[in-house]
């Protein structure tokens, strides 16, 4: 939060308006460049990242289908329903079967061959997102991945703040590299269902 406060104090209102307009324009340009179809799924938790991407895609004329996965009564399922009461988009939910979950996770670990906890968790989640997309005849799914990496959404950025711009950029490059590697693994998992996972906020143009 400290870095955001300093940025807000540094810029005046007109500067912030310009930054907001430029950011929105760049997000739209990235979506237009990498998203080939008008009907798309959006991996949707109801959080800021997925809600932002969903709203922008809808405003751009895409036929948005929200895709939510989780265990029954999980936070993501409950919260996504609440948020979509305002968005009112097509919304589909896949509840994870706890009986088959261990087998699925074991299979995915064998495919991606890593002990990295975050990478495993995301690949497992996108296995189910891709399965849901496939059942709806969707082959393109958009995610909001990249917001935390690019806009200092991790505690590591607060810890790096005292090191100045150079240290913050070092942390950002590391976070982005990890995220890009993770999304490559995610697409390997999603390919089982012939689904492509796209990240407009991690495109080379946007970064």
Regions found by a protein language model. Name each.
Residues 1-14:
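N-terminal segments that mediate ammonia production and transfer
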Residues 15-207:
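ATP-dependent adenylate-handling active sites, centered on carboxylate activation for C-N bond formation
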